[in-house]
């Protein structure tokens, strides 16, 4: 979900309990649009992160350590002047909007009492962090300067009077009176889109969840939703302050820890995406090209359906050769295949026998085309399957795995090796410890590793696992030739997790002995065929997978 007003409401409550009456000890700006305050509160030190990033804007406590620039910016120098040693008096969310105001008190150089408000506006590309004088509402400094030419509604420059962002007529879902709420719930269309316009601070996911629950007892359902306790929940791709329906996620003790984990993982994913962008683009282009090629080949194969018709016409002309006239462009003969008369087109320049041979040649040509096209289609389908497997691996790869996937694409001829580019050393296969505490399970994280694991490392009697009919890793239970059902389930869950079905609630996984696997001649790396497998059904669990991994 997005960092919406609903999420912000919960995190402000968390920050208020931790930081109010604390003192600001240090102020740093590790990145251009981010600010970190070190605060001493309740005999503990906390790091408060405020981010005006256009995509990752947020406010949270963080355990992450940052490297600070050697030379502080003007913004930081002004903040240190007003905030160093300041007491945090309050932390408030403006209505249910994505604006937080932190009021602090301090003493200036001559000992006079002063108050200031540190404001963070989390509004996408318009996100900002401002320090405002409490009494005069004058802006003391702002992390992003916005002049009149950029925004005619309000100027965000030092010395300007602070004007809040324009408000809408939408209502605060946390403070709305029962009478007004009852009227809305009875008279308005309660779709997610309409709920977003009626109430402040609802992101798409929050609005979708609210629409889902507003079916019966709407007033109490609404109140219960907005009054529920914070129970942070992290999924593979999102986060929420409370668990949403159909959202199997990992619980967290607090929202700040959840955000630390989410943004650390997201930063890793973004770095991987950046590093892998060339490979992803190349694979997507090759997939598109091969899918287009497959459609064309299938159309051409469809056009060969009349091959049998040519053979039959050749046979009929041969059988009734004496009835076929010269110098005619057609003849009608009895068709003993259908017991109906048939008209056969002729070439007047040819003899009856030559016309028959012409039909046989056309039949033979189409017959050869069928075999040729069938082989081509199988080859193209295999290429598409291979590229889909690479695409799956790329989407799940870490930074250290990108180079090995590139090497694989070089070896399979999809990209060229750069000048002076070294051949990548093969990374060791990942090992996981099964629930019995002793069995090792190997996982191939790309097709070269899959090939090595299945056809070089694994013993014939060992069990092999793969997600059914979708791209994924090869998984082998090593050494244990009679594994328990629990160990088999562990291996199946690994195969499900490292597959295209990672985010599914239920994944089918094939299990078979290595000796029953077949590597087709000329097949792409990691491609196998098999029959006689058993199929398990499991649910991928990221937390369990992480706990199984051997360091």
UniProtKB/Swiss-Prot annotation:
The keyword ATP-binding does not apply. Residues 363-551 are annotated as: Required for fibronectin binding. GO terms for molecular function: ribosomal large subunit binding; rRNA binding; tRNA binding. Keywords: Cytoplasm, Protein biosynthesis, RNA-binding, rRNA-binding, tRNA-binding. One of its GO terms (biological process) is rescue of stalled ribosome. Its main location: other. It is found in: Cell surface; Cytoplasm. It comes from the Bacteria. It holds the Pfam family NFACT-R_1. Disruption phenotype: About 50% reduction of binding to immobilized human fibronectin. Greatly reduced mortality in mice (tested with encapsulated strain D39). One of its GO terms (cellular component) is cytoplasm. Gene3D superfamilies: fibrinogen binding protein from staphylococcus aureus domain like, ibrinogen binding protein from staphylococcus aureus domain. Key component of the ribosome quality control system (RQC), a ribosome-associated complex that mediates the extraction of incompletely synthesized nascent chains from stalled ribosomes and their subsequent degradation. RqcH recruits Ala-charged tRNA, and with RqcP directs the elongation of stalled nascent chains on 50S ribosomal subunits, leading to non-templated C-terminal alanine extensions (Ala tail). The Ala tail promotes nascent chain degradation. May add between 1 and at least 8 Ala residues. Binds to stalled 50S ribosomal subunits. Associates with stalled 50S ribosomal subunits, binds to RqcP. Interacts with human fibronectin. Belongs to the NEMF family. This is Rqc2 homolog RqcH.
